[in-house]
């Protein structure tokens, strides 16, 4: 799938973006490169390959760098709310803006 300059200008118009001709041509090149990459990926035969829920686990050197999500510091609510102009029952009070 290849886009034309008219397509890029129409998309910009629909997105309410003002785009100069030079920018539109540059964007056209980038989008066509992206769609070319997508076409290459779609051309790969993946029959018989089970999808991975978390593909990063298959790369050992990357997976080992990840750590468990654990609490590393304690947040003191009173200290954080002390500079607030208005607090009630541990909640910040803000002015009503919608009727």
Curated annotation (Swiss-Prot):
Give the UniProt record's GO annotations in the biological process aspect: glutaminyl-tRNAGln biosynthesis via transamidation; regulation of translational fidelity; translation
Q: What is its EC number?
A: 6.3.5.-
Record-linked SUPFAM superfamilies:
Glu-tRNAGln amidotransferase C subunit
Q: Which Pfam families match?
A: GatC
Alphabetized GO MF terms:
asparaginyl-tRNA synthase (glutamine-hydrolyzing) activity; ATP binding; glutaminyl-tRNA synthase (glutamine-hydrolyzing) activity
Q: Which InterPro entries match?
A: Asp/Glu-ADT_sf_sub_c, GatC
The record lists the catalysed reaction(s) as: L-glutamyl-tRNA(Gln) + L-glutamine + ATP + H2O = L-glutaminyl-tRNA(Gln) + L-glutamate + ADP + phosphate + H(+); L-aspartyl-tRNA(Asn) + L-glutamine + ATP + H2O = L-asparaginyl-tRNA(Asn) + L-glutamate + ADP + phosphate + 2 H(+)
Q: Which UniProt keywords apply?
A: ATP-binding, Ligase, Nucleotide-binding, Protein biosynthesis
Kindly report, in one word, the top-level EC class recorded for this enzyme. ligase
Q: Does the keyword Ligase apply?
A: yes
PANTHER family for this protein: GLUTAMYL-TRNA(GLN) AMIDOTRANSFERASE SUBUNIT C, MITOCHONDRIAL (PTHR15004:SF0)
- Summarize subunit and interaction data from the UniProt record for this chain: Heterotrimer of A, B and C subunits.
The record describes the protein's role as: Allows the formation of correctly charged Asn-tRNA(Asn) or Gln-tRNA(Gln) through the transamidation of misacylated Asp-tRNA(Asn) or Glu-tRNA(Gln) in organisms which lack either or both of asparaginyl-tRNA or glutaminyl-tRNA synthetases. The reaction takes place in the presence of glutamine and ATP through an activated phospho-Asp-tRNA(Asn) or phospho-Glu-tRNA(Gln).
Family assignment from sequence similarity: Belongs to the GatC family.
| Matching NCBIfam families | gatC (TIGR00135)
* Designated name of the protein: Aspartyl/glutamyl-tRNA(Asn/Gln) amidotransferase subunit C
Q: Which organism is it from?
A: Burkholderia vietnamiensis (strain G4 / LMG 22486)
């Amino acid at each position: 799938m290849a886009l034309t300059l008219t397509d890029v200008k129409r998309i910009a118009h629909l997105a309410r973006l003002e785009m100069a001709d030079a920018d539109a041509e540059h964007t056209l090149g980038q989008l066509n490169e992206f769609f070319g990459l997508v076409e290459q990926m779609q051309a790969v035969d993946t029959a018989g390959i089970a999808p991975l829920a978390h593909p990063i686990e298959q790369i050992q050197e990357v997976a080992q760098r990840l750590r468990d999500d654990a609490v590393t510091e304690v947040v003191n609510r009173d200290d954080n709310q002390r500079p607030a102009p208005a607090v009630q029952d541990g909640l910040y009070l803000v002015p009503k803006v919608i009727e």
